[in-house]
């Protein structure tokens, strides 16, 4: 994205809290974005325990940072309204964490259960999930979206796959046209750096 993008959009303040927070619903809160300028990252007391486990590092920290940064970007330059028209009737607010919506969300066109909460969380989940996922991991999400008949054959119509692909296409276009950013190149860089962190082979003096 370049230094000018970083200077303009990167959060000016990071706030780190030792423990995670919990909402009244019992759902864990991993972070927040505030006013286009600040990101609060929670649970940093547990970072040493999770930093060498890619799955936990993704779920609790890296995806959270990227998710909240999407909110920062959206607060600065709004995303296309067509995104919300892909699955307009399938957002369920706080019910996303109930057992009814905890599985099968891919077939409804969502990449995570949390995506079902509301439109702005959906776009943040699509972008953050995509850029931390290897091609194989992303394809696994799409595979879960495939609807099959009783014989295990894929149905002719695949609304979940179509919706996820459409949302990703909108996100890629939004970042490219608004900021000149190629999300595929971002993903390559994120995965490379994450591999360095997990392996313990990172150098903060060379981030080119």
Which ranges hold each PLM region?
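Active-site-flanking segments in enzyme catalytic domains
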Residues: 16-208
């Amino acid at each position: 994205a370049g230094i000018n993008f970083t200077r303009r959009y990167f959060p000016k303040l990071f706030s780190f809290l030792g423990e995670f927070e919990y909402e009244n619903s019992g759902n864990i809160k991993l972070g927040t974005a505030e006013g286009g300028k600040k990101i609060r990252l929670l649970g940093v007391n547990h970072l040493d325990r999770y930093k060498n486990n890619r799955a936990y590092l993704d779920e609790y920290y890296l995806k959270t940072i990227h998710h909240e940064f999407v909110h920062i970007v959206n607060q600065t330059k709004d995303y296309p309204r067509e995104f919300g028209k892909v699955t307009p009737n399938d957002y369920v607010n706080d019910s996303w964490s109930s057992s009814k919506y905890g599985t099968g969300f891919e077939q409804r066109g969502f990449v995570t259960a949390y995506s079902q909460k509301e439109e702005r969380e959906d776009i943040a989940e699509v972008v953050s999930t995509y850029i931390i996922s290897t091609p194989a991991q992303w394809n696994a999400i799409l595979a879960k979206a495939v609807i099959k008949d009783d014989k295990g054959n894929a149905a002719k119509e695949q609304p979940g796959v179509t919706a996820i692909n459409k949302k990703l296409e909108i996100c890629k276009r939004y970042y490219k046209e608004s900021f000149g950013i190629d999300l595929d190149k971002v993903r390559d860089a994120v995965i490379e750096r994450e591999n360095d962190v997990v392996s313990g082979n990172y150098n903060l003096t060379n981030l080119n």
